[in-house]
Amino acid sequence: YNRRFFRGRDDVKPAPKVYAIMESNDIEKNHLQFFGTSMPETERTKAEKQIKYLLQTFVDAREYGSILNVDVCDWELLDRFVNDLNDNGQVTFESLGSEETHEKLQGLIKIAKVMSKKYDAVVINPPYMGASGMISTMIEFIKQNYNNGKSDLFSVFMLKVARMLKNNGYASMMTSYTWMYLTSFSKLRGEMLE
C-alpha cells in the first residue's frame, strides 16, 4: 500500500491511460495514399493493411466502447506510417483534409495500443444492462464476441477483463452476485473457471 502513489517519485509519475473511444466512421480512407510514401513498399503495405484493420474495428466504436477487441499491431510501424504524410506540398482536392486524417489516425492508434495490451491488474465498475435493453447491433456484437456473457452487459465486461489480464494478473470488479447462481450465467461461470 502506498498512499502517495498518485504523487509518484522524483522521476516517475503514474500516467493513467484514460481515453474517450474514438470512431473511425469519418476518417477519410482515400487519404491513406498520402501516408508512408517514403517507406519501403513491403512495410508500407503491411502498415496500410493494419491501419485498415483498425479503421474497420473502430467503425461505430462508441456503441461498443471498451468491449471492442483490438489485436496487437506493429505500433512502431504504424506510428512511422502515419507520421510520414506526404502531399508534395500541394493541396489538391484529393489531399484536402489529410492533416485532419493524420491527427485522427494518431489518436486512433494511441487508443488501439492501450486496448490491445495485457495488464497486471484491471479494476472496473461495469455497466449493468440486460439484453432486453440493448440495441440489435450490440446484441449481435456480443453474440459474436462474448456469447457466454450475453445475459447482461456486466457479464460481458467480466469476460473482457479476463482477456485483458496477463497470466496471474489481478481483477477487481463491482458486479452483481447473481452470476454465481442464476442458470442464465452458467456458461459464464464455466468460462471464468477455465
Mark where each language-model region is.
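SAM-dependent methyltransferase catalytic region
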Residues: Y1-L193
